[in-house]
Amino acid sequence: MFGLRRNAVIGLNLYCGGASLGAGGGSPAGTRLAAEEAKARREGGGEAALLPGARVVARPPPVGAEDPDVTASAERRLLKSPGLLAVPPEEMAASAAAIMSPEEELDGCEPEVLSKRPAVLPLLERVSEAAKSSGADGSLPSTPPPPEEEDDELYRQSLEIISRYLREQATGSKDAKPLGEAGAAGRRALETLRRVGDGVQRNHETAFQGMLRKLDIKNEDDVKSFSRVMTHVFKDGVTNWGRIVTLISFGAFVAKHLKSINQESCIEPLAESITDVLVRTKRDWLVKQRGWDGFVEFFHVQDLEGGIRNVLLAFAGVAGVGAGLAYLIR
């Protein structure tokens, strides 16, 4: 065993240009041994000739240890050195970060900045978590609006916009009747929600279907679970228009499902549930963002860009990409 290990060190040292290691270090005996080993190499024995085979019996390595390749060249053994195979942690992290995340695979192209794409997959994960976090008695928490919200302008405007959008999505047709409480600002917000929300649904239909299966909404009692999901979504403290519009878009997706199973009476409670959570938990943020006016401004599309978008979507529609490509999360 010592002979094998010693010869490997000699070969590595010779390859690196260092002095050979004899039995006695720098002693004459060590010098003579190095000369004999060099002679054996020149005569064609290679690394195997350095082994005193008649005098030393190679013992098998311990269990789990790698059997040294005594016939390999010094260069080959050097390349197999464990130290050379070690990768710095920062390089490993960079390699892992380079792998495309599932979110990036949702969109075939991204004509606008990444900051406005609604993140759907994280919501799917939170739906899964929320579905497992029901109360010990199996009941779902309800979220009735505080009494003061019933007379709140932001609440009334939000409820009217969200309720109108969900009903339109369920029936498949626009309601031509003017908005009451929301007024002109609500009309602009509804138009923006139609454009952005429809695109989100088309672009992330598969993810929404998975979320709907997890919630298993079949009646009005099941609609209450949507409140728990939304509350859980905002649990991390992150609030932005992309996340809000994604939740409303998913609510519209649920409204279509309710229509398909003859549960249209649940659509209005669903709209109330969405409005309750948004206004109750995110009132300060909504006020700071100027409410629905801020929503319109955030997703505003310039006329020039709109013309370009129409051309791009004409081609994108052939590939089934959909109008949701442009609406990215902040």
Curated annotation (Swiss-Prot):
Motif mapping: BH2: 284-299
Membrane topology designation: Single-pass membrane protein
TM ranges: 307-329
Pfam short name (any one): Bcl-2
Residues the record lists as Phosphothreonine modifications: 143
Site residues, Cleavage: 107-108, 137-138
GO BP, one annotated term: positive regulation of apoptotic process
InterPro entries in UniProt: Apop_reg_Mc1 (IPR013281), Bcl-2-like_sf (IPR036834), Bcl-2_BH1-3 (IPR046371), Bcl-2_fam (IPR026298), Bcl2-like (IPR002475), Bcl2_BH1_motif_CS (IPR020717), Bcl2_BH2_motif_CS (IPR020726), Bcl2_BH3_motif_CS (IPR020728)
Motif (BH3): 189-203
Domain of life of the source: Eukaryota
Motif BH1: where in chain: 232-252
UniProt function note: Involved in the regulation of apoptosis versus cell survival, and in the maintenance of viability but not of proliferation. Mediates its effects by interactions with a number of other regulators of apoptosis.
PANTHER family assigned: BCL-2 RELATED, INDUCED MYELOID LEUKEMIA CELL DIFFERENTIATION PROTEIN MCL-1
The name this protein goes by in its record: Induced myeloid leukemia cell differentiation protein Mcl-1 homolog
Species this protein is from: Rattus norvegicus
